[in-house]
Design a protein with these regions (language model features):
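Sec-dependent N-terminal signal peptides
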Residues: 4-14
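Gly/Pro-enriched, hydrophobic low-complexity segments
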Residues: 122-226
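Short, exposed beta-strand/loop patches in secreted or surface proteins that constitute
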Residues: 31-33, 56-61, 105-117, 146-148, ...
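N-terminal, post-signal-peptide region of Sec/Tat-exported proteins
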Residues: 44-78
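Residues that act as N-cap/strand-start positions at coil-to-secondary-structure junctions
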Residues: 51-53, 108, 141, 214
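Flexible, processing/modification-adjacent segments and terminal tails
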Residues: 20, 69-143
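Positively charged n-region of N-terminal signal peptides that target proteins for export
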Residues: 1-4, 19
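N-terminal leader/targeting segments and the immediate start of mature chains
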Residues: 16-47
Length: 226
């Protein structure tokens, strides 16, 4: 009985170790294209002055400008302007979070430690003070990424945490595109994005951003219009 228990323990320990050290080879990164698609959105701000915007829009530029924005429950220009500002912010954050994982973490593996914490889920922490400074994080702040991958190694969730300052979680559902499909969506921008990387278009993004200092939580969902 003891021998069997020992075997299971060793197998589990070896599996955990292998997964922990395998994050950077497990990760299969695809550049995301956000252009030339129509999307449905739902944005809610929870706090003292709650806000709620639902409707559809189109992303039309490299700055993720929301055009053709239509709200389901309001036609006031100030509401449309506010919704467009929030949409741009949500998309910029989602894209920046996604890209930073690759640009900062993947290319500078030695500056991060990866800890396996659950099936296909890793915690990434800064390994040195130099990396903290580059990421504009104070030396006393507790900061880390939680990254979930699917069975094939593609990103499904990124959580960026600076304790007592902010907590951002974004879930990604993506569709890999052929070079022809990517070019049709992104035009010349795909020549920059593609390189040797695969390209995807997101079909659904869900996220939340909380900041205890302002006592507000942003909850949003943006998905491709069928």
């Amino acid at each position: 009985m003891k021998k069997t228990a020992l075997i299971f323990y060793l197998l589990f320990s070896f599996s955990s170790f292998a997964q922990e050290t395998d994050f950077f080879t497990k990760l299969k990164y695809t550049d995301l294209i956000f252009y030339q698609k129509e999307y449905i959105f739902d944005i809610r701000i929870k706090g003292e002055n709650p806000e709620n915007y639902t409707g559809n829009f189109k992303i039309s530029s490299n700055d993720y400008e929301a055009t053709n924005c239509i709200l389901n429950s309001s036609r006031h220009s100030k509401d449309i302007k506010r919704a467009k500002e929030l949409l741009q912010k949500m998309i910029l954050i989602s894209n920046a979070l996604y890209r930073s994982l690759y640009q900062y973490v993947y290319y500078d593996k030695e500056h991060y430690t990866a800890s396996y914490i659950a099936p296909n889920c890793w915690k990434l922490s800064f390994a040195d003070e130099e990396t903290r400074k580059r990421m504009s994080v104070s030396k006393d702040a507790v900061c880390y990424f939680i990254v979930k991958l699917d069975e094939n190694g593609y990103i499904t969730q990124i959580k960026s945490v600076i304790e007592e300052d902010r907590d951002i979680t974004v879930d990604y559902t993506t569709k890999e595109l052929s070079p022809q499909e990517a070019s049709a969506l992104g035009g010349k921008i795909t020549e920059v994005l593609m390189g040797n990387n695969l390209v995807s278009n997101f079909t659904n993004i869900k996220g939340s951003i909380s900041n205890p200092n302002v006592k507000k939580t942003f909850v949003f969902e943006i998905k491709t219009k069928q």
